[in-house]
Amino acid sequence: MLDWRAPISSVYYENSTGPCSYTVSSEGTFSIDLKRKRTYEIENDHLRDFFDSDVVANDELLTKYLAKNKKAVLGEIIATIQQEQNLIIRRSPKTNLIVQGVAGSGKTTVAMHRISYILYNYEEDFRPEDFYIIGSNRILLNYITSVLPELDVYGIRQMTMEQLFIRLLYEDWDEEKYMVHTIDRADEKNSIKGGSGWFFDLENFCRTYEAEQIPREPVRLEKTGTLLLDAEYIDNYCREQSTLSMEGKMCMLNEILLAKFENEVSGKEVTFPAREKKALKRKYEKYFGDGKWRGSIFDLYLQFLEQQEEKGKAVEVPENSFDVYDLAALAYLYKRIKENDPVREASHVVIDEAQDFGMMAYQVLH
């Protein structure tokens, strides 16, 4: 008896009879000669039928099965997995994957089987808490989480896209003060907020704001005039450290400047009195800021919207009530400006009904 997720089980789903192979991670590829493929139909502990096939697909069984059982549970669907579905399920979890298909083609089912497969075969890399399932409504999410145990999957977190972005705002979100409203997709202004162009505008806004907040002038040591940091170094550092927030860059630049200062005043001919040295050290410790940005993400977002209006891209200004794209923008501002101690979130996100969300949401998640 073999688990359907085991590497050798791919032989059943992917191959016709005859010479074929399967691959086991870290052990290599094994060649075999597949003599027979047989599928059994068992109902109430009785063998009802069986099918021999020398082709890959299980179309005959699938058609018969779905015709008599419109409410199939996931554990029973395993027997009817098709070759293309199997390839999706078993694809490496290291890359992004988009599954496209008509309504009712099994996209959600394949996604759930894929989670089960990854947890089984990559147990050293992934745990249930590494997964988020994102859906457009709670009804669908509740269904997904209720049936995942049939695939031996437990502890997967699920939430709407709005809830995900709120989660990424951490302590800045006050549920007693702020509300969430459903986006009106028929409103043309909302389609503007959901596009890539809107994200690029927000990205440029953050870049400009950061340049205004972090001093770019050369830093020279008082008394000697020795150059500690030049403008080019500061500019290059801010550009290269793209994963750090503005607050994080300020903290790191302070540390770099302080190290340069300590190196310069140690063992040099020009000596500094202890009091003067202490005062300079205190100054350079906070030269780029005291390590805590004290602005408001929400005020900054309103500032961005005002700039957009000046460019002829006016949208409704939220008054403590936000739609999914407002929340996406707020989460991005938090990440770019304020985040200084990143919290480990999911490493694998499954988004159901992905077409319901504009590129703004995906650009922010990326």
Where would I find each of the regions flagged by the language model?
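N-terminal accessory nucleic-acid engagement/regulatory domains that precede
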Residues: M1-K64
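Pre-Walker A adenine-sensing motif
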Residues: A79-R91, R336
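Pre-Walker A (Motif I) flank of P-loop NTPase domains
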Residues: P93-L97
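Hydrophobic anchor at the beta1->P-loop junction of P-loop NTPases
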Residues: V99-G101
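Walker A (P-loop) phosphate-binding loop of P-loop NTPases
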Residues: G104
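Conserved lysine of the Walker
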Residues: K107-T108
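Post-Walker A alpha-helix
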Residues: A111-M112
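Alpha-helical nucleic-acid-binding subdomain
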Residues: L119-V349, Q355-V364
